[in-house]
A protein has these predicted regions:
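Membrane-interface alpha-helices at helix entry/exit sites of multi-pass transporters
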Residues: 2-7
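A feature for the membrane-embedded catalytic helix bundles of lipid/isoprenoid biosynthetic enzymes
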Residues: 8-148
Length: 148
C-alpha cells in the first residue's frame, strides 16, 4: 500500500512539474503564469483518476493522459528542433499572461492545460456515475439512521 501511495503521489507531482518546467524554460515558452495554470489543470486531471480509484476501486484512464503529453512533447521538441535552423521557431506572440510566444512548445503547454481541464471533467463525470451506481446498489450506512 505504501508503495502504491508513494507511486501515485510522485506520478501526480511529476505530471505537473514536467509541464511547468517546459513552460518556464525561456527557450520554449518562458511564461510562468501559463506554466502554473497548465500545471494546475494537468494535476487536477491526473488527480481525478487517482481519486476515482480511491473511492470506487476502479482506475479511470480516460482523457488526456501522461502518454498523450509525452507524445505531444516529443512531437513539439522535434518540430522546434527542425524550425530553429530556419529561424522559424517562434510564429508570433499572443497578448495573454503578459505576452506568450507562439512556439511548438508553448502550444504543447496550452494543449496540456486544456487536456487537463477536459480530463478532469471527463473523469469526474465518470466517477460520479460510478459512485451513484455503487450507492444505489449498496448504500453506506448513515449515522443516526434507524435500521428499520
Amino acid at each position: 500500500r505504501w508503495g502504491d501511495m508513494l507511486d501515485h503521489t510522485i506520478d501526480r507531482l511529476l505530471d505537473a512539474v514536467w509541464v511547468l518546467a517546459l513552460a518556464l524554460n525561456p527557450a520554449f515558452c518562458g511564461q510562468a503564469s501559463l506554466g502554473w495554470t497548465a500545471a494546475w489543470f494537468t494535476l487536477l486531471g491526473s488527480y481525478m483518476g487517482t481519486q476515482a480509484q480511491a473511492v470506487t476501486g476502479l482506475r479511470n484512464y480516460r482523457g488526456f493522459s501522461r502518454a498523450d503529453r509525452m507524445v505531444l512533447t516529443l512531437v513539439s521538441l522535434v518540430a522546434t528542433a527542425a524550425l530553429i535552423p530556419f529561424d522559424a521557431a517562434i510564429f508570433g506572440t499572443v497578448d495573454v499572461f503578459g505576452g506568450v510566444p507562439i512556439t511548438a512548445m508553448s502550444l504543447m503547454v496550452v494543449v496540456s492545460m486544456l487536456g487537463g481541464v477536459w480530463t478532469f471533467l471527463t473523469r469526474f463525470r465518470q466517477a460520479a456515475g460510478d459512485v451513484r451506481r455503487m450507492d444505489a446498489k449498496d448504500p453506506l450506512p448513515q449515522p443516526g439512521a434507524s435500521d428499520e
